[in-house]
């Protein structure tokens, strides 16, 4: 596409993954820090500037702080377009051969592979590509400056300023709700990585990447009608609490190639929305307490279930619809409709301390101290104890379930006594079942409700009787 860029640039490179062994350097990401930002200014100068080390000055295999700030100017540009334009950085960087871009805002994660580095790719080339693609895709951008920062202290300094801008954008949509509008928006920008994912954006549910709210999406659909963000007619409200709309289902069905038939906007248990991989946080169901934990991308520890964020991410990313798991933005946690189909904040039992503090104002005051963090509990057993001690709403259900199980167990024992001598139903399975050897019998007790016991015994084959001569 560009003669002065040493690698190919275009949509054919979208979806390319850069694995660890193929990586030359990593920029920002979970083991470092960084951000991306677009700002509308009065007068840009069409310059590309690098502050800090370029790629060839970095150690191979290293992880480095990174920031990219794009300043655009034009007579028809408005500040409301910043978030929309900013999200396109994801697309433009993935156009570059050997560059993998994931996530958004202050969660950005970039890898550059060895082949592209060896071909001569440097940060100045990346800056030029971003600059040219912005001007080519959006003719109303007259001038575009791109500043790439790798100096650690400078990245930290600018990161705090960027976060203030992100928060300011998110505040704008608070007065608008789903019942106030007739149109929602969809985004398929991540389908190069998650082919069946359709992100549904409403006034009460920002994009799960956290980079696009309802007003951003509306602006994006207007300035680029054929782009990845489009209108979704709301249609008939089939279930207000769960957030089921006929128009949403129709569009999701079409855009997911028929893979997803129906979605609920505000439930993690019943037909949740699909997730790509750019989500800021994951809601996950904890069956032992009939409640939810939420882990954000920056959390490096383990959840009470004994697994980290990275493992949870693998459960629901890639455009899958997985009941019990759903990717969300942190802004959605501040929405009045947050998981309302599942009980909202009363169903949340665990958060990392950092995330809990970050959304403190959104958590009902009477629940704040009843939600555990990694400092309070390490296991589900400890979580159960914590919830009971604190009087969390979920603790009532835990007690009720235990009592119900005890009653059922007594009833079963009484029934078994009454019909003493009856043969317990058994099931002989094929030898290949679950990797078991042949000749194994599995006996299920009380299997009408659940499997209370599994007894594995070796079944000796009957000896063949010798025929009399």
Curated annotation (Swiss-Prot):
The keyword Nucleotidyltransferase does not apply. One of its GO terms (biological process) is acetyl-CoA metabolic process. Its EC number is 2.3.1.169. Disulfide bonds: none annotated. Signal peptide: none annotated. It catalyses: Co(I)-[corrinoid Fe-S protein] + acetyl-CoA + H(+) = methyl-Co(III)-[corrinoid Fe-S protein] + CO + CoA. One of its GO terms (molecular function) is anaerobic carbon-monoxide dehydrogenase activity. [Ni-Fe-S] cluster binds at residues 187, 190, 276, 278. InterPro entries: ACS_CODH_B_C (IPR045822), CO_DH/Ac-CoA_synth_bsu (IPR004461), CO_DH/Ac-CoA_synth_bsu_3_sf (IPR038571), CO_DH/Ac-CoA_synth_bsu_arc (IPR023432), Prismane-like_sf (IPR011254). Its cofactor is [Ni-Fe-S] cluster. Coiled coil: none annotated. Keywords: Acyltransferase, Iron, Iron-sulfur, Metal-binding, Nickel, Transferase. Binds 1 [Ni-Fe-S] cluster. Monomer. The ACDS complex is made up of alpha, epsilon, beta, gamma and delta chains with a probable stoichiometry of (alpha(2)epsilon(2))(4)-beta(8)-(gamma(1)delta(1))(8) (Potential). Part of a complex that catalyzes the reversible cleavage of acetyl-CoA, allowing autotrophic growth from CO(2). The alpha-epsilon complex generates CO from CO(2), while the beta subunit (this protein) combines the CO with CoA and a methyl group to form acetyl-CoA. The methyl group, which is incorporated into acetyl-CoA, is transferred to the beta subunit by a corrinoid iron-sulfur protein (the gamma-delta complex). NCBIfam families: cdhC, PRK04456.1. Belongs to the CdhC family. This is Acetyl-CoA decarbonylase/synthase complex subunit beta 2.
